[in-house]
Amino acid sequence: MTTSSSGSVETSANSRLGTFSFASASFTDLLGGNAGAGGGGVSRYKAMTPPSLPLSPPPVSPSSFFNSPIGMNQADFLGSPVLLTSSIFPSPTTGAFASQHFDWRPEVAAAQSADQGGKDEQRNSYSDFSFQTAPASEEAVRTTTFQPPVPPAPLGDEAYRSQQQQQPWGYQQQPAGMDAGANAASFGAAPFQATSSEMAPQVQGGGGYSQPQSQRRSSDDGYNWRKYGQKQVKGSENPRSYYKCTFPNCPTKKKVERSLDGQITEIVYKGTHNHAKPQNTRRNSGSSAAQVLQSGGDMSEHSFGGMSGTAATPENSSASFGDDEIRVGSPRAGNGGGDEFDDDEPDSKRWRKDGDGEGISMAGNRTVREPRVVVQTMSDIDILDDGYRWRKYGQKVVKGNPNPRSYYKCTTAGCPVRKHVERASHDLRAVITTYEGKHNHDVPAARGSAALYRPAPPAAAATSSHPYLPNQPPPMSYQPTGPQPYALRPDGFGGQGPFGGVVGGSSFGGFSGFDDARGSYMSQHQQQQRQNDAMHASRAKEEPGDDMFFQNSLY
């Protein structure tokens, strides 16, 4: 009995030492030896060699984190089945290693995400041991790069973090195999077009608004268009606008339908352009703006057409594209192929087209503004006689002046001159008369012949009893230095009457301070008035009437 007990103690001791000395002996052998009868179980278990682990040590092996006891080889520990069956065979060797707790399962790692403070570096170092992420292909990188970020899926922190680290690399550094076509396809609008239509207007650069393609089409087609009508059509919620090419004699027109938010929904062209595209549109618009500024006023406020007998005579205006109020005074473009558009035009626009042939057409069939002459006089009456005959056709109150403005037109047939008269807002005695255009005729004769036989000055009456001799020049060349108290009517051009008499003396009746432009304008009228006076004086001498005998009897 003593011998057997001592032998069992020696066997158990030897077996424990063999656990640390031999790769084939382990604590499992002791269990097999004690349970088997006659030692047959132990020999049968020893005949079965443990399978070798098919693991190759990675660049950073987890074995470097183990604190092995002195005298123990790490290779023996990897060859032992204790590493794989520690949960099945309870043994004192299971908790013998005082190292950190390792769990290679991703579920446990996800549950311990709150304890990431001091273990992030360790997880990154050995994450390739358990979850070795394969390098993504070029197609995968393209898809991942431009897709919007998604919430992390429940696959572990390490895998999601490695996926997020690949995104900036794929965006900033283009792979070697990606060509221009593939890159353009990767930037395609598939991820963005899947959203609702509210995401259609994308914001670019510094906050600019990217218009839809259909809206850029109307503004960037290279041609100049003028809007001439707009109306609400049946069967459509959007209003329809009508445009016409501004090039002379170009029959091209187009219809544009816009939605309520301003986006273009449909564009229909009618006809073809018979000219090339303009070279520089901005230069033409700049010159038009310069003409408007040079004219010194807005012609749109003169609504000529109320009493003139014609239907809304189009005024002199520069070509302003896309403006509904301004007309171009060129002849109407050919109607070939434009009947469909003319049927849809509003009635008011058709009326305005009846007067397209009127106006002053200059070079290039484009209407040019005539110069303006502004004369300011001090008078208590509104009607100032300048020698021409005028017809009043309108009156209205303009912005910035409480006094009404009266509009006049020259009564001579074919004369384009117009004027408007108003009193200044700061001084009620100041009458401002603005002339537009130039007269293409002479100054008409005054109504009646009494003006031709007005009494001569006292000095002229002393030298001759007959004021009008056949070889004597008319008295219009005489300009006395003293005031003339017998002026027949006030005058609006510095005191110079229409028939040569000086009103108000050498000081021009107090109407001083005119500039050179007004002076040249008045000198032109003076020459015309002198010619008319000479003509009427010669006719009066050739055919004397009863008034002549009556005048001679007075002297």
Curated annotation (Swiss-Prot):
Please indicate the residue ranges that the annotation assigns to the motif Nuclear localization signal: 253-259
Q: Which residues bind DNA?
A: 214-278, 379-444
Organs and tissues of expression: Expressed in aleurone cells. Mostly expressed in aleurone layers and leaves, and, to a lower extent, in roots, panicles and embryos.
Question: Which ranges are annotated Low complexity under compositional bias?
Answer: 163-183
Region of interest called Disordered, as start-end residue ranges on this chain: 133-183, 197-248, 270-365, 514-555
Bias category Basic and acidic residues: which stretches?
347-356
Q: What keywords is this UniProt entry annotated with?
A: Abscisic acid signaling pathway, Activator, DNA-binding, Gibberellin signaling pathway, Nucleus, Repeat, Transcription, Transcription regulation
PROSITE patterns from the UniProt entry: WRKY
Question: Where is region (Transcription repression of gibberellic acid (GA)-induced promoters) located?
Answer: 466-555
Q: From start to end residue, where is composition biased (Polar residues)?
A: 277-294, 310-320
InterPro entries xrefs: WRKY_dom, WRKY_dom_sf, WRKY_plant
Q: What induces it?
A: Induced by abscisic acid (ABA) in aleurone cells, embryos, roots and leaves. Slightly down-regulated by gibberellic acid (GA). Accumulates in response to jasmonic acid (MeJA).
Subcellular location field: Nucleus
UniProt GO MF annotations: DNA-binding transcription factor activity; sequence-specific DNA binding
Keyword field contains rRNA-binding: no
- Write out the coiled-coil annotation as residue ranges: none
PANTHER family (alphabetical): WRKY TRANSCRIPTION FACTOR 33-RELATED, WRKY TRANSCRIPTION FACTOR PROTEIN 1-RELATED
The similarity comment for this entry is: Belongs to the WRKY group II-a family.
What the protein does comes down to: Transcription activator. Interacts specifically with the W box (5'-(T)TGAC[CT]-3'), a frequently occurring elicitor-responsive cis-acting element. Negative regulator of both gibberellic acid (GA) and abscisic acid (ABA) signaling in aleurone cells, probably by interfering with GAM1, via the specific repression of GA- and ABA-induced promoters.
What protein am I looking at? WRKY transcription factor WRKY24
Organism per entry: Oryza sativa subsp. japonica (Rice)
Lineage, opening ranks:
Eukaryota, Viridiplantae, Streptophyta, Embryophyta, Tracheophyta
